[in-house]
From Swiss-Prot:
Keyword Methyltransferase: no
EC number(s) given by UniProt: 3.4.13.21
Enzyme class: hydrolase
Family, similarity comment: Belongs to the peptidase S51 family.
UniProt-recorded name of the protein: Peptidase E
The species this protein was found in: Salmonella typhi
Family matches, as PANTHER family: ALPHA-ASPARTYL DIPEPTIDASE, PROTEASE S51 ALPHA-ASPARTYL DIPEPTIDASE
One MF annotation (Gene Ontology) recorded for this entry: dipeptidase activity
Main location: cytoplasm
Amino acid sequence: MELLLLSNSTLPGKAWLEHALPLIANQLNGRRSAVFIPFAGVTQTWDEYTDKTAEVLAPLGINVTGIHRVADPLAAIEKAEIVIVGGGNTFQLLKESRERGLLAPVADRVKRGALYIGWSAGANLACPTIRTTNDMPIVDPNGFDALDLFPLQINPHFTNALPEGHKGETREQHIRELLVVAPELTVIGLPEGNWIQVSNGQAVLGGPNTTWVFKAGEEAVALEAGHRF
């Protein structure tokens, strides 16, 4: 499988998806036709989200079609060489994808050679479940099971920092709560600016920041760019 799982879409001082464009270009391998799944968008319309994505990716020669715009979404997925899933609210993304019957077709198409690109919520959707999202559950997705394209759980936008005076839990504390009730999981704390690239059977960590791996009953392990999962 070919996957590009990004923690986030924007870095300080850079345009939207700017840091991801070289990564995407490097993994295209001649692919040009893409379907975009915009359902995580809540404060922007799906048309706006699709148009913005199409504009940014056009210089790479990628032709983007919004999955919500086509009469036959399953046929569009089958024809697509690239499946792109944008960030936003992971619960809405999963709900809409499940209700439209897209989960199994997307997973099958990616397993048969389509490139999967997802940032934030889109990275969460590639995991076995969405249980490591940071998002508010604004809708009920009727279960947390997701695409299961990547075998580990990703927590995007990972940071353990708290604002001064803040008395809430750290991100690690939230992850540790999950590992109490689901000790079989492995969670990747993927900070902003980092990504996981899967190609030719290898999953490789990229980005300038330390990534953390959390397992039940074990200390967190720090990983740097180049680590192979």
